[in-house]
Amino acid sequence: PLLTVLDEALGLEHGVTTTIHSAMNDQPVIDAYHQTDLRLTRSAMQSIVPVDTGLAVGISRLMPGLAGRFECLHVRVPTINVSAMDAALTVRCDTSAAQVNALLHNASQQRLQGVLGYTEAPMASIDFNHDPRSGILDATQTRVAGTRLIKLLCWFDNEWGFANRMLDISQRLATFR
């Protein structure tokens, strides 16, 4: 959701994201065999593991205008739940951290309420466990280098947020009879 807001307001040019993701079910608890990725043979609870991601493809499907302009990395970390996206984004319009935060705060209070969150509280990953929103901007971490390079940190409980979006879709579909 935050990419849409920033693209509409400031015009996204390029982006590099790193998803810092909790351990997944295909990772072993102790070192063990993995079919496709040697890094994933390492214990999920003892290693920080870079893995492949299809996020850039997903972004281009949701936002076709950004196709070919995003690169994404994915790192799995030894936590049980709650992940974060660290995004570096270039935009067409000059901006500031205060303006970026204001744009995202307004969206979280209006059209994306319940989907996009916003916090200025000093929180850590565990504080977002079972948060139903798709992403929560940590406004204390927003940075702007120069006037067009934005750095953001967005927290999310992947499965819980996804389940809530599926519930939203189901409720919406139920209105079409």
Residue ranges and their predicted role:
Residues 1, 95, 161:
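Residues that form or flank phosphate/diphosphate-binding pockets in enzymes
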Residues 1-10:
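Alpha-helical support elements that line or immediately flank enzyme active sites
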Residues 13-14, 19-150:
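C-terminal substrate-binding/catalytic lobe of Rossmann-fold NAD(P)-dependent oxidoreductases
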Residues 129-177:
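NAD(P)-dependent Rossmann-like dehydrogenase/reductase catalytic/cofactor-binding core
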